Curated annotation (Swiss-Prot):
Taxonomic lineage: Archaea, Methanobacteriati, Methanobacteriota, Methanomada group, Methanococci
InterPro entries, alphabetized: CooT
Protein name: Uncharacterized protein MJ1551
Length: 57
């Protein structure tokens, strides 16, 4: 299983992210427990080696 930490503008905002989806100007992230957060911004980097996702908005 691969879960990632999600950073928004350089700040850790979610852990154990399992799903990331881009819809319009929003990025929707869902964690291991089904909790969902929406961010207005763009995915800038996904580093699977470090298990990190970076969004800027």
């Amino acid at each position: 299983m691969c879960s990632c930490n999600l950073y928004f503008n350089g700040e850790l905002v979610m852990e154990d992210v399992m799903i990331v989806e881009k819809k319009g100007d929003k990025v929707i992230a869902i964690d291991l427990f089904g909790d969902k957060k929406e961010f207005v911004g763009e995915i800038k980097k996904i580093d699977l080696n470090e298990n990190k996702i970076f969004i800027e908005g």
